[in-house]
C-alpha cells in the first residue's frame, strides 16, 4: 500500500551508497587542505623573503669629514667610530657622498653651522647657500634641498623624497665659507621610511 502525503524532499542515503561516495569526499577534502597549505606557505615565504631583504631600515647619520682644505663647494661626509656618533646601515659612502641601495621613500635631514660665524654676518654669509641634491646618475640630477644662511650662522633642512637604487646624494656649501667641525652643529642623515 503506497504512503500518502508528500514524499521526503531529501534523499536518504543507504550505507552502501555512502561507502561508495566517501573516497571521493575524502579526495575533495584532501585537495582542499593541500591547496590551502600551498597557498598559505607561499604567502609566508613571501613575507619571510621581505623580512630577509629588509632586516633593518636603511639609515645613515654622517659627520663632516674635513681632512683636506676645501677646493670645491662639495662637502664630504664620513661615518664610523673615529667620527663619533655616525653610522651607515644600507646606504654606503662613496668618496664622501652617500649612495642609496634601496628604492623607497626617505627622510633627509641636514644641518650646517658656519665656522667663525658672527650673527650680523658678512655679505658673503648673507648670500651663502647650502644645497643637497642627486648628483649621480647625471640623468637623475636634481636639487632636493636648498637653504640660505641670511643673517644666521646655521641652516637646518629636511624633507621626504623618493630615492632609487644608485642615487648618489651630494651636498654643496658656497665657497670659501667653512662649516663647523663640531658633530652637534654639522651633520647629514637619511632614513628609509617605506618602499
Curated annotation (Swiss-Prot):
Domain named THD: residues: 58-193
Extracellular side: 45-195
InterPro entries from the UniProt entry: CD70, TNF_dom, Tumour_necrosis_fac-like_dom
PTM entry text: N-glycosylated.
Transmembrane segments: 24-44
Cell compartments where the protein resides: Cell membrane
Intervals, Cytoplasmic compartment: 1-23
PROSITE patterns cross-referenced by the UniProt entry: THD_2
Cysteine disulfide partners in this protein: 117-153, 135-170
Record-level GO cellular component terms: plasma membrane
Membrane topology, from the record: Single-pass type II membrane protein
Induction and repression of expression: By IL-2 and concanavalin A (Con A).
Tissues where the protein occurs: Very low level of expression. Detected in splenocytes and thymocytes.
GO biological process entries: adaptive immune memory response involving T cells and B cells; B cell mediated immunity; B cell proliferation; CD27 signaling pathway; extrinsic apoptotic signaling pathway; T cell mediated immunity; T cell proliferation; tumor necrosis factor-mediated signaling pathway
GO molecular function, one term: tumor necrosis factor receptor binding
Residues annotated as glycosylated: 65, 116, 172
Function noted in UniProt: Expressed at the plasma membrane of B cells, it is the ligand of the CD27 receptor which is specifically expressed at the surface of T cells. The CD70-CD27 signaling pathway mediates antigen-specific T cell activation and expansion which in turn provides immune surveillance of B cells.
PANTHER family the UniProt entry points to: CD70 ANTIGEN
Subunit structure: Homotrimer.
Name by which UniProt lists this protein: CD70 antigen
The organism of origin for this protein: Mus musculus (Mouse)
Encoding gene per record: Cd70
Amino acid at each position: 500500500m503506497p504512503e500518502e502525503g508528500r514524499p521526503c524532499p531529501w534523499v536518504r542515503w543507504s550505507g552502501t551508497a555512502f561507502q561508495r561516495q566517501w573516497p571521493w569526499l575524502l579526495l575533495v577534502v584532501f585537495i582542499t587542505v593541500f591547496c590551502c597549505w600551498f597557498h598559505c606557505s607561499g604567502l609566508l615565504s613571501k613575507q619571510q623573503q621581505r623580512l630577509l631583504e629588509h632586516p633593518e631600515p636603511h639609515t645613515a647619520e654622517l659627520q663632516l669629514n674635513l681632512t683636506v682644505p676645501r677646493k670645491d663647494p662639495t662637502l664630504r661626509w664620513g661615518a664610523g667610530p673615529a667620527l663619533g656618533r655616525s653610522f651607515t646601515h644600507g646606504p654606503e659612502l662613496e668618496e664622501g657622498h652617500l649612495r642609496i641601495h634601496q628604492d623607497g621613500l626617505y627622510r633627509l635631514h641636514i644641518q650646517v653651522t658656519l665656522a667663525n660665524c658672527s650673527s650680523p654676518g658678512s655679505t658673503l654669509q648673507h648670500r651663502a647657500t647650502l644645497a643637497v641634491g642627486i648628483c649621480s646618475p647625471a640623468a637623475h640630477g636634481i636639487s632636493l634641498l636648498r637653504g640660505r644662511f641670511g643673517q644666521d650662522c646655521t641652516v637646518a633642512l629636511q624633507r621626504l623624497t623618493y630615492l632609487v637604487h644608485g642615487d648618489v646624494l651630494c651636498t654643496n656649501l658656497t665657497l670659501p665659507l667653512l662649516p663647523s667641525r663640531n658633530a652637534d652643529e654639522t651633520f647629514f642623515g637619511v632614513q628609509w621610511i617605506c618602499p
